[in-house]
Amino acid sequence: VVKEKLFTKMTRKKIIAGNWKMNLVADEAIVLVNAISQLQRTDSAVELMVFPPALYIQSLKHTTLKVGAQNFYPAEKGAFTGELSINQLKDVGASIVLIGHSERRELFFESNSFLKEKVDTAIAHNMPIIFCCGEPLSIRDAGNALEFVTQQLTESLFHLSPAQLVDVTIAYEPIWAIGTGITATVEEAEAMHKGIRNAIQAHYHSSEIAASISILYGGSCNPSNAAELFACPNVDGGLIGGAALDATSFIAIANAF
């Protein structure tokens, strides 16, 4: 009998991922990555990742950071003008992908069923995933936040086997608190992260699987609130937006563990 590995907050992977979105040009991307690499603590247990525009993945792949792709189309190849496949992204150096980001859901109408296709495509190509979930203000105000997020996970992610989940990290985005002037409290962040972990445990009938998955906070995480957020039992890092475009801020967040 193989003894199961016991996961805790201490042993779960700690991740700080920078989503650059549609920002920077080539020279700026290289300058930023070099600055992050120089400031990075060599003794840190925190894994740093950046998700640049796809154009720049190849020029950044030799960095000390893990470089990921913000988006892809769930097909091998074909008549999908303007899109990129997993194989194309792997070929230029991407080693992880974002799936389900709130901007993809809202601006590009990516549904739970379409996101399931993306999850399946990534898994089929052995590509690790950061899967984003989160609720808008109307859902939170109605008291249905956890139910809504659990449905996102159920319809797009929870069909995976426990073995396939090994390559999945979850990022919670409180959409209602991003760019709205409303700030999510540390208590609200922890409550949702705990709720997500409980949903994993309930679906897979395993506290061990639930305890093994890193859950990142994708709200407005910055150097001033990072330490308080990362002290929460169920917050294992951050998916960082604006602060990821500044090397000093990005490293300050990483050093907040």
Where are these regions (language model features)?
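Short hydrophobic transmembrane-like helices used for membrane targeting/insertion
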Residues: 1-2
